[in-house]
Amino acid sequence: MINKPFSESCEQNKDPILSIIKQYFSEENTTVLEIGSGTGQHAAYFPYHLPHLTWLPSDTIENLQGIESWRQSTNLPNTLAPVTLDVSQTVWPVTSIDYIFSANTVHIMSWQSVESMIAGIRKILKPNGIFCLYGPFNYNGQFTSPSNAQFDLWLKSRNPESGVRDIEAIIQLAQTISDNGPLELINDHAMPANNRILVFQKQTT
């Protein structure tokens, strides 16, 4: 077993995030798909505090071993083995899901990948299902803090296709007319360190 990967930001944000998502991921016998589980820390922590549901971690293949190491260290009965998910692929490993959670992903991805992710979520999320998206966002094209502006510069220095996203663009993607029903923004929670949790609900068609 490899050493478990560790992110200090995941350690710091896990409790603030949990305080929000537990309000929405509340139904018994449901499953949460986590898109972009990264180090696996959230997938090891949240299911312990949400024993009424099953947590399904996912990420690209190079991150699965680290996620699995966290899963095995906690050995929680309601955490499934991580699955490979590349949001740019048209076929996902899940065809229907109750809830979806993703943290610190859309500012790392290219915009094309963000479009693919939102389209995939709209396809697999059940009617009235909830999607919680955590991370930094701009409002009216403006950064909400100097630190977010600096973070955006750092992201773009690593990959010009990355960057802090405009909330209006995310909402537009979520609501664009398609066969799979729109996602309506039902809440926008302020979080520590100039982050947000956007809460979307799948609308019935």
Describe the residue ranges of each PLM region:
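Conserved class I S-adenosyl-L-methionine
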Residues: 28-38
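A short, conserved alpha-helix within the catalytic core of class I
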Residues: 109-121
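Short alpha-helix
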Residues: 161-178
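Core SAM-dependent methyltransferase catalytic element
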Residues: 178-181, 186-205
